[in-house]
Regions:
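A short Gly-Trp-Pro
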Residues: 1-140
Length: 140
């Protein structure tokens, strides 16, 4: 099975359709404070690379959340649409937005050292600390 595929999805109200041509099947959970504050818990998302398009782009608002990334949301229903690395133009999109989720595999946990102690996932995953994540992504 390929690690990437084409995926389609939408926001909660349907005002925005997502087309990701290189959607990874590997789901990652981010436990950083920003993601938990943004969504009320860990962000469960997939890397979609740069080949992503949206129908209904006029309904997308973007929040500049750090020096290296921004977050998009539907300005009609509030659905979280993406976390985008600015320089790479790389999209990380919440997996729950996609129509077909059966091929996803839970693979990574980011900012594992920031995860609150009141929850944990049973899946065996590749875990990265805050320092490891920042070293890999913040400078790019």
């Amino acid at each position: 099975m390929s690690d990437t595929m084409k995926g389609t999805g939408s926001c909660l109200c349907g005002a925005i359709r997502i087309i990701a041509n290189n959607l990874s099947n590997k789901v990652g959970a981010c436990h950083c404070g920003m993601c938990r504050k943004w969504g009320g818990g860990p962000l469960m998302a997939v890397n979609c690379g740069t080949d992503v398009s949206f129908e209904g782009e006029g309904n997308i608002s973007v929040f500049n959340s750090s020096d290296w990334a921004e977050r998009g949301f539907c300005n009609k229903c509030g659905s979280h649409l993406f976390y985008r690395l600015k320089e790479r133009k790389q999209y990380i999109i919440p997996m729950g937005l996609f129509d077909d989720q059966e091929t996803f595999v839970f693979n990574d946990q980011l900012f594992i050292d920031k995860k609150p102690s009141f929850y944990s996932f049973a899946n065996k995953t590749n875990d990265m600390t805050e320092a490891e994540v920042l070293d890999k992504y913040a400078g790019n």
